Every structure is written in structure tokens, then in C-alpha cells.
Amino acid sequence: MFAATPATSPVRGIFLMISAVTVFTVMSAFIKAVPNVPAGEAMFFRSIMAMPIILIWLIWQGEWPGGIRTNSVRNHAVRGLVGSAAMGLGFAGLKYLPLPEVTAIRFATPVVMVILAALMLGERLRLIRISAVATGLVGVLIIIWPRLSFGLDNTEALGAIMVLGSACLAALAQVFVKGMSGSETTAAIVFWFSLTSTLASLLTVPFGWVWPNPGEAAFLVGAGLVGGMGQILLTSSYRLADAGVLAPFTYVSMLWSVVIGYIWFDEVPTLPMLFGAALVILAGVVIVLRERQLGSNATARRKVSAKGLQ
């Protein structure tokens, strides 16, 4: 999601990435723990409670207010609305599916992103990418098929469709970020998304919000706080290590979701779900490693061309 700077400390970057996916999994568990709270309301708490943490971080980094200046409010608004829809669908799906299954379906995001980047940014689809995409899509189908086999009117099928829709919209949001990365700072992307998602969540008020009890309020506030921390940890990890180095460690969230789902929600992952998740994870890792290889080759070609001009 964020453009990487030259790697300075891969070990620290990996540690921060593992920390980020851990707190994001905890955030999802907090949202799942309040099934009576509408998804839009949960999104509001997730977004607004993260804002103070993000603002403190921006000030500490010396990126406030200069770092949030933007050349295109419209692009941030579009990206923010798409990302907000992805968040809302994901939160809604958590009510109907086990936490490990939601996590596994979300891993489809980089797979879908390859397809969207080819359609929207004109990126070439080579054989390795096509094979990885096909593998990932088969994995997703294996995960959601048991839910869909009961019919689309089943709540679990609805949950699977919601989470898959969330993954697709998250991929679309990342394509927008990729297109903006040349002109917008990471600080601007983080800040404007948090602001947009906070405002977008208010549009769901007419559809019915509830007054949370103290326990629910604690989980909602906690989701926002750890979500803000996760965003900072994620951003910081990409500043310290290359995306290709960090990518495999994002899948640690699968381990945490299985552990938390079993201990907290009495959820036991099925063999088809684990097999499908393995295929999706394999596809994601192959895609990222291939991207890294292509990036290295492009850098090498630029160096050769530069030497030829000397």
C-alpha cells in the first residue's frame, strides 16, 4: 500500500510488519466481538479513534501540516470512499464468518490487484502473474464454496460475498494509491483516508446506529486505537525494508486469526479453508516476489543505460 524507501533495517522492518498484522488481527477480533453494532458505526469508531494517534505520529515525524498537503483532493476522496466501502463490507462479513476464514478471503486482495492494475494502469500480465492469479482464485473458490453451496440466501454465503467484495474493493483502493504514489506523500494518503472514512461512516447513521453498552464501547474504542497503531507500524515497516522482504510476513495474520478465533470465539478452521488459504497465500507471495524481480531488473537496466551515456 505504501511506497518503500531504500531498505535501512530489514530486521526491524520485519518486526514492525509482524507487529502491524498482529494488531490488525486484534482489531478484527474487537469488531467481531460486537455483532450487534452496525458495520457503519463500527467503521466510525475505527476511523475517528485512530485520528488522534495518526495526528500525533505525523507531528512526531515532522510531517504536520506540510506532509498532508495534496495536489488532488478528488483522488483522495475517491480512494477514501472505495477504501471505506471495503472496510464496511469487511466489518459486516465478520458477523457471519469465522475470523480465520475472513482473514483467508482477504488475502485475495493482491491477486485481484494484479488484474485491476492490468486493466486500469496498463501493467502487463506475464505467464507467472497469470498462473499466480489463477492459483489464488482457485484458492478463494475453495474457501467460499462450502458457504455458497447452501444458497445465496444463507447468512454465511452473504458473509462470504461481503468479505470477497471487501477484498476486491481493497485491491481497487490500492490501485488508486499506486497511481497516486508518484505525486502524494504517505502522510497525505494515511491522513486523508482516515478523514474520509470517518465522514463516510456518518452516511450510515440513517440506517440505524445503536447505543453501545460499556463493553461494546470499550471494544469499539480499542479497535480504533489499535487500528491507528497498526497503520503507523505498517507504514514504518515499509520505510525500513523492501516490500518483497516484508510480504511473506503479512501472512502471520493467518496464524493469529486461527489462534484468536479458537480461543475467543471457539472457531475451528476446516481443512478446505486451510487448503484454500494456502493456495491464496502462495499466489500472493509469488506475485510480490515477481514484482520485486521485475523491479530489480528495471533498476539494473537503468544503471546500464546510465553507464552507456557516460
Describe the residue ranges of each PLM region.
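Membrane-interface interhelical linkers
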Residues: 1-19, 51-78, 151-154, 184, ...
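Cytoplasmic-side transmembrane-helix entry/capping segments in multi-pass membrane proteins
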Residues: 10-17, 70-81, 125-138, 156-160, ...
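Juxtamembrane helix-loop-helix junctions in multi-pass membrane proteins
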Residues: 23-50, 172-196
